[in-house]
């Protein structure tokens, strides 16, 4: 279930983009992306998975590999766009591994260097048991697999939109909004934050 901050961020996004349809859901190509869905970025996705898991990615994703993005943004005359609200668990050493592998031609709708810096300097302890750190077979069966799975899924959401004619995934971090996300000015401040990210 979405957390309080995520719900507030999506609500502020709707106020910031009154002409857009902002809704829950995930594009079909992101549900279980294998070789076909990754298209020309299959080798890149393979290299990301290999760096995280030290083995090759199967060409067809297992049926249990499903996911939900935080929101999809649709505006008339523009390609659709994924919105993701990244809380502290999205910034860690595994995410840094993925971000370092992005080639220069990967367009992002978030400050890549900020995301990399936050991931490299995160002091968040990565538990290897319990809900946050449990194994996530079949792709990430080791203890702590949930953390690695999250980093891989974030990378897929960044790398695959261009393959399918979608705009770059828009990311907003909790540390960018915590001081004002629940305020009456949240929508306007979200709009200010997004200037330059929505091109």
How does the language model describe each region?
Residues 1, 59, 63, 145-149:
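Conserved aromatic-histidine-acidic binding/catalytic patches
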Residues 35-36, 94-98, 183-184:
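Short aromatic-enriched loop/helix-cap "lid" or pocket-rim segments at secondary-structure transitions
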Residues 88-179:
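Catalytic cores of nucleic-acid endonucleases
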Residues 1-21, 150:
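Nuclease catalytic cores
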Residues 37-39, 184-192:
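Short low-complexity, flexible loop/linker segments enriched in glycine and/or proline
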Residues 192-199:
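Acidic, His- and aromatic-enriched active-site or binding-groove loops in soluble protein domains
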Residues 20-85:
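Active-site metal-binding core of divalent-cation-utilizing nuclease and nuclease-like domains
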Residues 6-7, 66, 154-155:
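Conserved glycosyltransferase catalytic-site signature
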């Amino acid at each position: 279930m979405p957390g309080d901050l995520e719900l507030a961020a999506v609500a502020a996004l709707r106020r910031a983009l009154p002409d857009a349809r902002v809704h829950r859901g995930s594009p079909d190509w992101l549900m279980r992306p294998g070789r076909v869905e990754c298209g020309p970025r299959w080798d890149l996705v393979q290299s990301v998975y290999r760096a995280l898991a030290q083995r090759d990615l199967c060409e067809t994703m297992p049926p249990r590999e499903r996911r939900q993005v935080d929101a999809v943004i649709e505006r008339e005359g523009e390609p659709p766009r994924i919105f993701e609200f990244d809380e502290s668990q999205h910034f860690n050493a595994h995410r840094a591994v993925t971000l370092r592998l992005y080639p220069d031609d990967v367009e992002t709708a978030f400050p890549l260097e900020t995301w990399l810096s936050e991931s490299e300097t995160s002091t968040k302890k990565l538990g290897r048991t319990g809900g946050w750190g449990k194994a996530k077979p079949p792709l990430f069966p080791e203890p702590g697999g949930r953390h690695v799975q999250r980093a891989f899924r974030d990378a897929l959401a960044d790398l695959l939109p261009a393959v399918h004619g979608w705009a770059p995934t828009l990311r907003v971090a909790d540390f960018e909004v915590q001081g004002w996300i629940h305020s009456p000015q949240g929508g306007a401040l979200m709009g200010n934050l997004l200037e330059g990210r929505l091109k």
